[in-house]
Amino acid sequence: MMDWLYRYPPLYPGILLKRYKRFFADVQLTSGEIVTAHCPNTGPMTGVSTPQSAVQLSKSDNLNRKLAYTLELIQVHDNEPTWVGINTFLPNRVVKLALAKYLFPELGEYSQIKGEVVYGLDKKSRVDFFLTGSDEERPIYLEVKNTTLSEGRLALFPDTETTRGQKHLRELMALLPLTRAVMLYFINRGDCTEFSPGDRTDPVYGKLLRDAIALGLEVLPCRFDISPEGIRYLGLAKLKI
């Protein structure tokens, strides 16, 4: 099996009591202590915030932090018991590591990786990654989307209406065909083998994605194995459009 792309720091198991005000989660640790952890996910976390679920927390030694613990993983039982990554700051870090290891052959050859490059019609957006290679190769604008919603083995994005995500699609479409535009869906759970746009949660996004694909947008629905030990890349999910 492929080596770990990312290893978690020591994690503390517990049971989720409730998540509230987006940024807070009350968790009972195995010791019985109840702590309030930071929830690094501003989305609705549909299907991945059920009370009484097993969770894993990291702990910071920074005494200036108001909350020492951070919610990192939650276990779901939609299929077999599966850990789901909650921390939305991790996908970009993991993708950067994967890009450095050239784990996505679909991207072809590139020699430079830049992050947070300004682009867009109003020059007010930043693309997650900008890849360049030889003069003969078109540059690649690559956007990463954290994906946790599922129906059975089917991963879905988004899990709620996302005007920001719609804007990103429109801006990537505007780059075509002079550059390559790639949408990488980071499937933050190992039990999904297929990917589709979440038409029920955001039909506008689904239509935009299909329109973008017709214009040449490339889609990489990337599967990742998530565990308290770390994160591994599993390859591409089947794209169902």
Curated annotation (Swiss-Prot):
CDD domains: SfsA-like_bacterial. InterPro entries: SfsA, SfsA_C, SfsA_N. This is Sugar fermentation stimulation protein homolog. It holds the Pfam family SfsA_N. Gene3D superfamilies: 2.40.50.580, 3.40.1350.60. Belongs to the SfsA family. Coiled coil: none annotated. GO terms for molecular function: DNA binding.
